[in-house]
Structures are given as structure tokens and as C-alpha cells.
Amino acid sequence: MRIGIVVDSACDLPQDFIQRHNIVVLPISVRIGEAVLADHRDEEATLSFLQAHVAERGHEAETTPFSVNQIRDLFLQQLVIDYDHVFCLTISKLRSQIFDNAMQASFAILNDYKPIRQAAGHTSPFALRVIDTLNLFAGQGITAVEAARLRDQGQSVAVIRTRLEQLAEHTYGYMIPRDLYYLRARARTKGDRSVGLIGAALGSALDIKPVLRAYRGVTEPVAKLKGFEPSAEKLFGFTVRKIRDGLMTPTVCVGYGGELAELHALPGYAALQGACQTHGVELLESVMSLTGMVNVGKGALAVGFAAEPHAFSA
């Protein structure tokens, strides 16, 4: 049984991890003025687009997910031949059209694949499962890493599916934006109310940073802390405590809206690296997706892991 894993480009995972595990990326296109980039999780392309466009006018960006037809074509031209079963893991459907597009495409794919597979010499049926990760950015990485791990172990499709659906319900994605004015301007552009309870002007004047949590599809502020670096340190410290308590998978994903050297220099990051090493947890760090950056702003920090239900505490 050849099992394929598909994610959308909002999923924060390192480029080499994606390549090593043959993870297929559905690109999300970002348009800022006349500049357009289809995000294929290329960190250099993301950083140069960030310098050129996102920092100044990112809040005006329009993001376009892969359409129903594009998803159908990708599957029928490639994936129904390369794989027997595909897991398609998407950003929370409350945040993007991708889940709905993939679901819609799946009906056409399952209708039309047989002659294509037969021509390629495969007589067995093809199946796919679209799973809402109920999360975003670094949080999305957790289910994808687990899918790759279970596939490498030779687990069955049924075992993998059950595990991923359970994991999605227990994945936490924490984020700290660096610039509240940006966040408010972006929310206004999108008509998004989820950051409404933050007074951006007041927050910026007092250097207050919200800690946003994505959990079971919902994104909301769970704390307000002072200063970006102290806030990052508190989030790393909280993650270390969760690692010591025991995570549900041996993985922590970190996404950063800029050069990774800046992430490494943040207070508390070395302690997080040490805790991961001590407890046998894989720390996967990546430049945040372009979609992530235009939505939460340059220099934002995101941390994802799976754990039993808990409240955030600084």
C-alpha cells in the first residue's frame, strides 16, 4: 500500500523534511499589489518576498488557495498513479477554503481515476481522505509529521486515519504577533473578528503582545504579555513544561516570520532545544509560510504541539 501525504503551504515544516518524506504541497498564492508568489514552501523565495513586499503592505495581501479544479488535476495527473491512498491534511476550514475545495475535488477524483490508474498498470482501487487539522501554521505540522512517522512504521491506513483524527482534536498552535497595528489592519482587511478584543493602539503603546491559541478550529487570545522577547521566552518556557508533562507525539513545530537566526537568538529558545533533546522530542523549525506571515505579520512566532487539554499559563 503506497500512502501519500498532502498538506497546504500554510503548514509550517522545514523544506528538507517535506522533501525527505515526499510530502506534496498544495500551494497558496499570495498577491500584494502587482506582485504574486505561489508559496511552495521555498524558504529563500519566502524571505525575499517578505523583504520586498510583506513588511510594507502585507496587510493588503490577497491569498488564493488551490482551487477545486487545480486539486482535481494534481490528483488525476500524478497522485492517483503514485499512490494507493492519500491523506490530505488542511488548515482549519474556519480559516480557509482549502478543506472545502479538497472535499469537493475528492468526489470528482474518485469518479474519474479508474481509467488513469489502469493505463498506468494499477488495477487496485484508489482512496483519499481529507482531514481538517483544526489548526494552522506550526500547529498543522504536527499531524503531517505523525502521518509520516506512522507511514514509515508500516501502519495501516485505518490506524493512521484514526490517529490523525484524534490528534487533530489535541493539537495546540500558539502564536505571538510582533506588530499589533499590522494584526489589526489585516483583521480589518479580512473582516476577521477573532482579534477584536485587543485594543491595538493601546497594546502597541504599552508593548502588550497577545498570545493567540488555535485549538479545535478556533483561534483566540488566551493571554496578554508585555514585550515580544519576554513573551516569546514565556511561550518557550510553557512549551518546555508541556514537554516535561509528556506530549502526545514526540514533536514540536516552530514557525518564525523571518530569518531563523533571529529565532535562535530569542531568549528561552536554547532551553526549548535542550528540553527537546533531553526528552527525545524532535524540534522542527521553519520560516513561517507566506500565508502565515501576511496574516499575523513579519517577525511573528508560532509553536505547535499535541497535548492533553490544558490552559495556557505564563
UniProtKB/Swiss-Prot annotation:
Residue ranges constituting the DegV domain according to the UniProt record: 3-307
- Binding residues annotated for hexadecanoate, in chain numbering: T63, S96
Q: Keyword Translocase on this protein?
A: no
Q: Which GO terms describe its molecular function?
A: lipid binding
Q: Name one Pfam family in it.
A: DegV
Could you list this entry's UniProt keywords, alphabetically sorted.
Lipid-binding
Note the superkingdom of the native organism. Answer: Bacteria
Q: Does the keyword DNA-binding apply?
A: no
Per its database record, what is this protein's job? May bind long-chain fatty acids, such as palmitate, and may play a role in lipid transport or fatty acid metabolism.
Q: What is this protein called?
A: DegV domain-containing protein XAC3508
Source organism of the structure = Xanthomonas axonopodis pv. citri (strain 306)
